[in-house]
Amino acid sequence: MGISVDINFPLQLSVNIAVVIVFLKLCTNMQNKNGPMTTDEQYDKIIDACRNTFLKKTADYGTSWRVYRIISVADQIYIKAKRIRNIQEGITQKIDDDIKSEFAGILNYAIIGLIQLDINNDEPEELDAAIVKELYDKKAAMSKALMQNKNHDYGEAWREMSQESFVDLSLSKILRIKQIITNKGVTLVSEGVDANLFDILNYAVFGLILIGEGRH
């Protein structure tokens, strides 16, 4: 009796192996999607949400924030940080805004300040929405790069910090900004206004990340 050989067997085996490989890749991707987010992914999610709010307000009000001088931006951030501190200390609220929304407001005001530092006062007060998004994304990307560099050097030490520390550090940065403005922007060894705003922005992101994780 002769032995029959299925000449299609090698081809079928290859197809089956390919199907298994594709299936395993899909399973791996699903596990990754369902797993914990990376810090970069968390950062991007926070920025996306804050940008969405910022652009919606731009659609409603235009770029009315263009009239703000840096001292005014600093005051707005101070007000929000001080409000978070009051909430943390248990002072009775008469306004419904919570800590999360106040951190988001601080983030967006920090970006406003950074944009204002780049735009000359003699430019048009009203900016096109597309330009606003471009400027916002530019500052957010710079802030993220700063976060990545500091995480590389120090590890993610901020994950072990208290929410109160983020607020206190932001308040101290605001006081520094005001002093720099008083000194006409001149510093001897200290960082400038922009560096302080970037730090404030990242403190707000860190606060929002930890709130999202249920740790604050």
Q: Locations of the language-model features?
A:
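Acidic, Ala/Val/Gly-enriched low-complexity intrinsically disordered segments
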Residues: 5-6, 15-22
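Short, often N-terminal, low-complexity regions
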Residues: 11-13
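Intrinsically disordered, low-complexity regulatory regions
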Residues: 20-216
